[in-house]
Each structure stands twice: as structure tokens, then as C-alpha cells.
Design a protein with these regions (language model features):
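Catalytic alpha/beta core domains of metabolic enzymes, predominantly
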Residues: 129-130, 138-284
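Hydrophobic or amphipathic alpha-helical targeting/insertion segments
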Residues: 85-126
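N-terminal amphipathic alpha-helix/helix-capping segment at the start of soluble metabolic enzymes
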Residues: 1-26, 119, 281
Length: 347
């Protein structure tokens, strides 16, 4: 059952309250490079990013906000550490959300200033706790950044905002340990109704990062926990978007094209791996709620993938196009991709 959380608005995007799970990413261009940041922001929106975050390390970086906002329609999140004045300036510049931990910005007067401005401008705040940011007192209590330590830290930061009647809060608790990550989100889901931003931190390069994120994020979503997500990868941020969307698709939480393909065997008589990769690339920007199959042989292909809306299956130098398990065309191997895309266009 889906955990129903409080709903907040990041710009024009709903987070929580039963809204569809959104996919986020973060700019990795230096904040001093405004032109490059704008270019990457536009590319990430095109790739399907729904909420975009940018590091705002100093006052000069605040200039990024209006420059990026002018070119994209998705909300921009200011990622801020320690300096409460940056949060105030980011709010004035029109961010859709601030990411800041109130316990790290000074005394009550500073927390109150940020809470007041964000409340007036209807800007939510994401509290972002990770295993490297847990307070020393909490670490001493638990001995390590355990799931309970992460949860306690997040609730501590939330209480600082609640003191000043600010409750438009999103919470994330990220660990590089998948097991700790999952347990932390399970605990926080039971102890508050704030929307949860899912992610596994410091997952590594593309291959291992995708594996850890799929398990850490996907297992929580499958149990109804989570309202928005970011897949953190040491890679092109566009890969974060693709992976996040794929996780949602695999769980049936978003529409769009689903690609299935067989693992190949000794009966395969075409370059199925090459064909499957080409089909995947061709489907990248197809906006249809369909399932497409790429199968290796005519013996099992149409039958095994009969639930697919469309598919291809290979033979010796040729292949079949099938629709809902029924063969509709036979074409030479070299024409399989084009023939498949023609049929997809007809749907």
C-alpha cells in the first residue's frame, strides 16, 4: 500500500500526497560556468528530469538561478550548506525548493529567517541527511551512522523548522550502504508524514551505481515508500534520469515504452544484442505507453512475448514483426529496426 504523505509544491510540481513519483538530477557543471550550467539544465529537462538541483556554494553562484529559470520549465532546487544568507538569496531569486539542513546554519534567528521567507514564498525545504553529515552527538549515541542515527538526525532538523511553524518539508536520508539506506527510510516513514526523497549516496560509477540504486530505491518504492527520487551516479547526469525512469517503469509506476528482450541462446541467428541496443536507443524519446519485445528466434519469440504490443524476432538473415503475439510482417534482418519503428508509429 502506498504511504500517503503530506503534499508540498516545488514550483509547479507536486511532491507527495499520492502524486506520481518524480525523477530528479543535479547539475555537475562548475557553478562559475553559467553558460555551461544553462546548457546542461536544458539537456536534462529534455531527458526527462522533473526537478533539477544546483549547488549554490557562494553569493556569485546565486546568479545561476535566474539564468537557468529563464530557459527551463521545471523547478530548480538550490543546494545550500551552512550559510543561511544563501538560502534567503536563493528564495529571492525564485528557486522552487531549498535544500538545507537547518541545524547547520546557526542559531534560532537564522533558522527563523529562512523558515519565514520560505513560508511567505511557498518554497519547500528539503532536509538532506547523509551518513557523512550526522551530528557528533548522535554519532556518539549510536556509534556509527546507523539507520536510527540517520532518522534521528532528520527529525532533529525538522523540529527546528517546526518550531517556527514551517512544515513544507521533504526529507532524505542517504547512506552508501544499501541495507542502512532501506532501514533508515523504513523508520522515517513510520515516524512522520513528510514526503520522502529517495536515493542512495555515493553509489559509484555507472554499473555498480545502477545496481545499488535499483535495489535501494526500487525496494522502497515497491512497498509504497517514496515520493521523489534521485539516482546518484559518477556519470553523466542524463544517466541518472534514464535510470530513475527505468526503475519507475520496471515497477509499473510510470507509463512510457517498456522494452523486453531475451538473453539469447544457441538458437539465435541474428545479432540480437546489437539489435536490442539499437531498438532501445530508437525508443528513447517515444512517448507511448507500450511494451516492445526483441526476441532471438522464431521458435519461441512471438509466444514468449505475446503480451508485447509489438516485437521482432530473428531468423537466419531475416526476422518477423509481431503484434500481440500474431505475426504481421517478414523482413530482411537489415530492415528489422526500420520496420519495427514503422509499426510503432502506426500505434
Amino acid at each position: 500500500m502506498k504511504r500517503i504523505s503530506k503534499q508540498v509544491m516545488a514550483g509547479n510540481v507536486k511532491i507527495g500526497g499520492g502524486a506520481p513519483v518524480t525523477v530528479q538530477s543535479m547539475l555537475n557543471v562548475p557553478s562559475t560556468d553559467i553558460e555551461g550550467s544553462v546548457r546542461q539544465a536544458v539537456a536534462l529537462e529534455k531527458a526527462g528530469c522533473q526537478i533539477l538541483r544546483a549547488a549554490i556554494p557562494d553569493m556569485d553562484a546565486v546568479r545561476l538561478i535566474p539564468a537557468i529559470k529563464e530557459k527551463i520549465s521545471i523547478p530548480l532546487v538550490a543546494d545550500i550548506h551552512f550559510d543561511y544568507k544563501l538560502a534567503l538569496e536563493a528564495a529571492a531569486a525564485g528557486v522552487g525548493k531549498n535544500r538545507i539542513n537547518p541545524g547547520n546554519i546557526g542559531g534560532d534567528d537564522r533558522v527563523k529567517a529562512v523558515a519565514t521567507v520560505c513560508r511567505e514564498k511557498k518554497i519547500p525545504i528539503r532536509i538532506g541527511v547523509n551518513s557523512g553529515s550526522v551530528e557528533k552527538s548522535i554519532l556518539a549515541k549510536y556509534g556509527a551512522p546507523t539507520a536510527e542515527a540517520l532518522c534521528e538526525s532528520a527529525l532533529y532538523h525538522a523540529s527546528l523548522l517546526e518550531k517556527f511553524d514551517f512544515t513544507d518539508i521533504v526529507i532524505s536520508l542517504k547512506s552508501s550502504s544499501v541495507d542502512t539506506n532501506i532501514k533508515a527510510y523504513e523508520r522515517i516513514a513510520e515516524r512522520c508524514d513528510y514526503p520522502l526523497h529517495l536515493g542512495v549516496t555515493e553509489t559509484g560509477t555507472l554499473r555498480m551505481g545502477i545496481v545499488k540504486s535499483a535495489i535501494g530505491i526500487g525496494s522502497l518504492l515497491q512497498r509504497g515508500i517514496g515520493d521523489t527520487l534521485r539516482v546518484s551516479l559518477t556519470a553523466d547526469p542524463a544517466e541518472e534520469i534514464r535510470t530513475g525512469r527505468d526503475i519507475l517503469s520496471a515497477l509499473g509506476l510510470r507509463g512510457g515504452v517498456k522494452l523486453v528482450s531475451c538473453p539469447t541462446c544457441g538458437r539465435t541467428r541474428i545479432d540480437l544484442i546489437g539489435l536490442a541496443n539499437k531498438v532501445e536507443k530508437a525508443l528513447e524519446y517515444v512517448d507511448k505507453d507500450i511494451t516492445v519485445a526483441v526476441m532471438g528466434c522464431v521458435v519461441n519469440g512471438p509466444g514468449e512475448a505475446r503480451e508485447a504490443d509489438l516485437g521482432v524476432t530473428g531468423g537466419k538473415g531475416e526476422g518477423l514483426i509481431f503484434k500481440k503475439g500474431q505475426i504481421i510482417r517478414k523482413v530482411p534482418e537489415a530492415e528489422l529496426l526500420d520496420a519495427l519503428m514503422e509499426e510503432i508509429d502506426k500505434l
